Amino acid sequence: MHETSLGTTLTDYLSGESIDETTYESFRQALARLLVEERGYPKDRLKAKQDICYEIDGEPFHRPIDIVVYDPDNRPVLLVMFCSGSVGSYEREASVAARLFPGGPAPLAVVTDTTSAALLDAAGGGVLAEGMNAIPRWRQLLEMAAERRAEPLTEEQRDRLVRIFHTYSGFLFGACCQDCRPTRG
């Protein structure tokens, strides 16, 4: 299953704006609602569909991340990625995405299918906790992020991680249709 338009719109929970309803948008909305209403995240610290932009052999690509959580200093501290398969299959991809995210690296990532989740130490690559209760509350998130401040990537590290990230993204190429891929340009 991939994200496609359902031909209707809905009101975005975070921005209040009318947005395109897609096959994944209800999940993204539910995740945002969970973070704000159950975990205490300030709504203005969450941004949906934030792009990771990168180049492969001089060709630009970008890939959206479902939700990015920013600390009070506007640094990314948590990337939240929805997955339509086994959460464990997406852990490495999410860790790499967190390390590549602009303004980061973000120290933490969550991968979830909305019934299960894995909280990841992006720099260390390990799973810190599993299950939906693994998603930390706001204050806990800030403490965890402060303990895991990641160093900026060197050019060589970034190049290597971009290749890894693109390889994961490349699995989307031709998997089900032409639209299911990272976007060029």
Which sequence ranges carry the predicted segments?
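A short glycine-rich, hydrophobically flanked beta-strand micro-motif that places a catalytic Asp/Glu
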Residues: 110
